């Protein structure tokens, strides 16, 4: 499998055009890269930036994060969404501090044993923190490969084995593999985008999709996920109340957060309890997990 133009041209483009993201700076630690990967899951970079900067200043190491209360960690997560990630990140820090001497593992298989770390995150940490030549495949990378290599507007259904094989075949056989992986991701995020690709700016403008005349995607258009009125929104409103209070709150205080649908509010609260993000005190009040009552 061959890219056109050469990997060096993609890397030259990356050096000129990449975004200035702090987790790419020299001196950033593997832990701080791991934190960024947790936060960037399903969350735009613009929302992650201020939270990540505050986080790594407050808790620069796994041990510092593990020593914090789970409530403080969930509170610091703010409005990044999917707050179970905050709880899992705290659990991950605890395991690293306790079982790995406070050092983020560099082995993909060991990384996969950590709480909240899946296939993508394990490989991203091995690649970007430890410069290992492992395939790192996210939605953006799959789209770039689909267009450049396979001549399709959209990627086929995800297949870990096939996707990793596609990207592995593209990786340079030298020490630049980690930068090449970052460049593929950057290209998909900023140029080879899903809805309005800027092919005139692409260093891989000889891609097969372009050569084929930009054939449209097959199948139904993907609809963006709704948020307004969903249980996710209700969960967020309830968590806002709990984050804004240093002490447990009553059910009546939570009711105010979503007064229009009692059944939906109760369902959202029960899901927060089931996820371990919220606890109910013996007196019936509610608090963030780990809150000192």
Please identify what each model-predicted range represents:
Residues 251-254, 288:
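Charge-rich alpha-helical segments
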Residues 259-273:
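Short amphipathic alpha-helical interaction segments
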Residues 273-286:
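A short, conserved structural fragment
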Residues 292-293:
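Short, amphipathic alpha-helical interaction segments positioned at domain boundaries
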Residues 40, 242, 269-272:
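Generic leucine side-chain signal with a strong bias for well-ordered alpha-helical environments
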Residues 4, 8-9, 13-235, 246-248, ...:
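Catalytic cores of DNA base-excision repair glycosylases
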């Amino acid at each position: 499998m061959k890219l056109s133009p050469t990997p060096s041209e993609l890397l030259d483009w990356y050096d000129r055009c990449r975004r200035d993201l702090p987790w790419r700076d020299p001196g950033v630690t593997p832990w701080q890269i791991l934190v960024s990967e947790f936060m960037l899951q399903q969350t735009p970079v613009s929302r992650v930036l201020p939270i990540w900067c505050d986080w790594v200043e407050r808790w620069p190491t796994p041990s510092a994060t593990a020593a914090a209360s789970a409530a403080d960690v969930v509170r610091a997560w703010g409005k990044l969404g999917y707050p179970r990630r905050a709880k899992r990140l705290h659990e991950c820090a605890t395991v690293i501090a306790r079982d790995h001497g406070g050092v983020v593992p560099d082995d993909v298989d060991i990384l996969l044993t950590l709480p909240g770390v899946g296939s993508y995150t394990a490989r991203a940490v091995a690649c970007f923190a430890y410069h290992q030549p492992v395939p790192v495949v996210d939605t953006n990378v799959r789209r770039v490969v689909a267009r450049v290599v396979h001549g399709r507007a959209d990627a086929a259904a995800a297949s870990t084995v096939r996707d990793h094989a596609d990207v592995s075949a593209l990786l340079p056989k030298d020490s630049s593999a980690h930068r090449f992986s970052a460049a593929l991701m950057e290209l998909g995020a900023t140029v080879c985008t899903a809805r309005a690709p800027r092919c005139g700016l692409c260093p891989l403008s000889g891609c097969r999709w372009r050569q084929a005349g930009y054939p449209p995607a097959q199948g139904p258009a993907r609809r963006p996920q709704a948020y307004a009125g969903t249980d996710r929104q209700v969960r967020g409103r309830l968590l806002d109340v709990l984050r804004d209070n240093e002490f447990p709150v009553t059910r009546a205080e939570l009711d105010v957060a979503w007064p229009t649908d009692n059944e939906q509010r109760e369902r959202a609260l029960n899901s927060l309890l089931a996820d371990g993000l919220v606890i109910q005190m013996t007196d019936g009040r509610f608090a963030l997990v780990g809150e000192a009552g």
